[in-house]
Amino acid sequence: MKTLYSLRRFYPVETLFNGTLALAGRDQETTGFAWWAGNARLINLSGKLLGAHVAHAGLIVFWAGAMNLFEVAHFVPEKPMYEQGLILLPHLATLGWGVGPGGEVIDTFPYFVSGVLHLISSAVLGFGGIYHALLGPETLEESFPFFGYVWKDRNKMTTILGIHLILLGIGAFLLVLKALYFGGVYDTWAPGGGDVRKITNLTLSPGVIFGYLLKSPFGGEGWIVSVDDLEDIIGGHVWLGSICILGGIWHILTKPFAWARRAFVWSGEAYLSYSLGALSVFGFIACCFVWFNNTAYPSEFYGPTGPEASQAQAFTFLVRDQRLGANVGSAQGPTGLGKYLMRSPTGEVIFGGETMRFWDLRAPWLEPLRGPNGLDLSRLKKDIQPWQERRSAEYMTHAPLGSLNSVGGVATEINAVNYVSPRSWLATSHFVLGFFLFVGHLWHAGRARAAAAGFEKGIDRDFEPVLSMTPLN
């Protein structure tokens, strides 16, 4: 597609050592980008860029399917998922597939089906990617105008945005349908230690749903990460799906207003930077969610949260010492505070010791022992159930600590047990990737703004050292 400006004026050109390493239409002369700059060569070749994106989707889905089958092949039903380094099966189990009361896996066949379906899908996507990258039309504008676009066409860009929003909304509603009609989802709060159940009484009150967004991110507030019942989670997906679909329809039907046309940079690289910024935010939120939230990420599958493991240890030793005759209500610890129980700054009865910092933890194995003023002494003396003892002992010994220095009082194992919690893996990976995406957002936003302002000239090539070197070939 011919454009009105020279590509060289807008994009800094990296000089190839060997100008012959290129395919027609994708070489440095016609695109202004060398081979290693990847999809930048395809900025104005919508057909080839489609191929790159479809092939990328194929790689993603292939990883999902292959890793899914790998986890199924290695899965041992007798051990908890979090002891086996699994990250995909816990997601499937949370959706209610293959599990029963207490999070026990009763059928691995749904996991196998999931892996195979993803592999088959990846083959279709892979074929489409190769077809559009190598055989399909270089540009879509002439043959398929609906799928064609010009990056500067603000109306077309917001139409594409609208289509994406509708697809995201449909995705949110798929979870709602699963929870309501197709077998339900796993609820860690179900009585007696968790079970799969259909969610019947959705929370649709905007005050509750949007109240999460208005909460402080700190302490006992915890912003949206503090959500602790499935009715709110599924109701939130109803709201989110509706907003995405309505917003998508809005963006398809309307053109950007004048203030939006002025405020944004309208180029391919600008859209890339916006997308990277959004993905970065997703990564940081996912990091906090998997680290702190034991409702959307049930501890039966992902292992306990850090605060949960710490509170579980305090509970385990309270149970032990109470059996040995300790009066847990009045015993003093080495600091003069309560050894087993103390009061929070606001007067609730909480666990004593170093775990006091986690006093606002909520967990399904602990909540039955709370009364109106925090932990209830009479319940701690008479009502502790065997499943609560078993679960807390299990969680105490599976803290997601890795090699953190501050362990919240958890007695760590010096003989290096080979255990890293999936919460540790998922939280750290999403934080690191979220950070990298943020850096990419800054990088591409800076380049896009410079190009729009007209002062992106690239490096002065006249004195480039490589020009005086012998060519590689």
Swiss-Prot record:
Top-rank taxon, per record: Eukaryota
Pfam family of the protein (one): PSII
Binding residues annotated for [CaMn4O5] cluster, in chain numbering: E367
Cofactor note: Binds multiple chlorophylls and provides some of the ligands for the Ca-4Mn-5O cluster of the oxygen-evolving complex. It may also provide a ligand for a Cl- that is required for oxygen evolution. PSII binds additional chlorophylls, carotenoids and specific lipids.
Lipid biosynthesis in keyword set: no
Regions crossing the membrane: 69-93, 134-155, 178-200, 255-275, 291-312, 447-471
Cleaved signal peptide residues: none
Subcellular location, record wording: Plastid, Chloroplast thylakoid membrane
Residues modified to N-acetylthreonine: T15
Single GO MF descriptor: electron transporter, transferring electrons within the cyclic electron transport pathway of photosynthesis activity
Keyword flag Cytoplasm: no
Gene Ontology cellular component terms for the protein in this record: chloroplast thylakoid membrane; photosystem II
Residues where Phosphothreonine is found: T15
GO terms (BP aspect): photosynthetic electron transport in photosystem II
Self-association state and partner proteins as the record states: PSII is composed of 1 copy each of membrane proteins PsbA, PsbB, PsbC, PsbD, PsbE, PsbF, PsbH, PsbI, PsbJ, PsbK, PsbL, PsbM, PsbT, PsbX, PsbY, PsbZ, Psb30/Ycf12, at least 3 peripheral proteins of the oxygen-evolving complex and a large number of cofactors. It forms dimeric complexes.
Family statement drawn from the similarity comment of this UniProt entry: Belongs to the PsbB/PsbC family. PsbC subfamily.
Function: One of the components of the core complex of photosystem II (PSII). It binds chlorophyll and helps catalyze the primary light-induced photochemical processes of PSII. PSII is a light-driven water:plastoquinone oxidoreductase, using light energy to abstract electrons from H(2)O, generating O(2) and a proton gradient subsequently used for ATP formation.
Protein name per its UniProtKB record: Photosystem II CP43 reaction center protein
Organism: Calycanthus floridus var. glaucus (Eastern sweetshrub)
Lineage: Eukaryota, Viridiplantae, Streptophyta, Embryophyta, Tracheophyta
